Design a protein with these regions (language model features):
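Active-site capping/gating regions of soluble enzymes
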Residues: 1-176
Length: 176
């Protein structure tokens, strides 16, 4: 009765296969990652109405907001660590880094690993999950084509705005 949905895993890569939404190991790679991340955030913020329309059907509209489905309002979840990084940049304060906590499984024979700092809340409509976004509002009968056309076009526009600003800057590093 409540319908079902699917997750649209979305990322952006170069023609050589480099994932531009994968956080980098060096400051330069992180600057590139943050630029593309901010372009996606801007795109979703500016065009949330088109993203919402791209998944609208009678059955899906009934499903959204109920029974562990994402809400009908488009919002982004980045996870605590990435949110803290962006807040540090915004306030021009040093990023202190998230404290890595180990998972406590209660089983000694399994290897120890750190708790994931990205999204584990499966009801977030548009969530960053480590090296990609999951757009979780699509109904099971929806094609991903319309949502991807809207998302790709919106991100392309944001990247064009950023490229124009960076190409015209006298100091690239400061503008970035």
């Amino acid at each position: 009765v409540n319908g079902s949905g699917k997750h649209n895993n979305w990322s952006i890569a170069t023609d050589a296969g480099q994932n531009l939404l994968s956080p980098g190991a060096t400051p330069y790679e992180n600057a590139q990652f943050l630029l593309f991340l901010c372009a996606v955030i801007k795109a979703v913020d500016d065009y949330q109405d088109l993203l919402r329309i791209s998944v609208a059907t009678a059955g899906n509209d009934h499903r959204l907001g109920a029974n562990e489905a994402p809400p009908a309002v488009v919002s982004i979840f980045l996870g605590d660590e990435l949110n803290a990084v962006l807040e540090a940049i915004e306030t021009d304060t040093p990023y202190k880094g998230a404290e890595k906590t180990q998972m406590k499984l209660g089983v000694d024979v399994l290897p120890k690993f750190n708790r994931d700092t990205t999204d584990r809340n499966r009801t977030s409509p548009f969530a960053f999950t480590g090296n990609k976004f999951e757009f979780r509002m699509l109904g099971s009968s929806n094609s991903i084509a319309c949502a991807n056309i809207m998302l790709n076009s919106a991100v392309a526009e944001a990247l064009k705005i950023y490229a124009d600003r960076l190409e015209g800057a006298s100091d690239f590093e400061t503008a970035l």
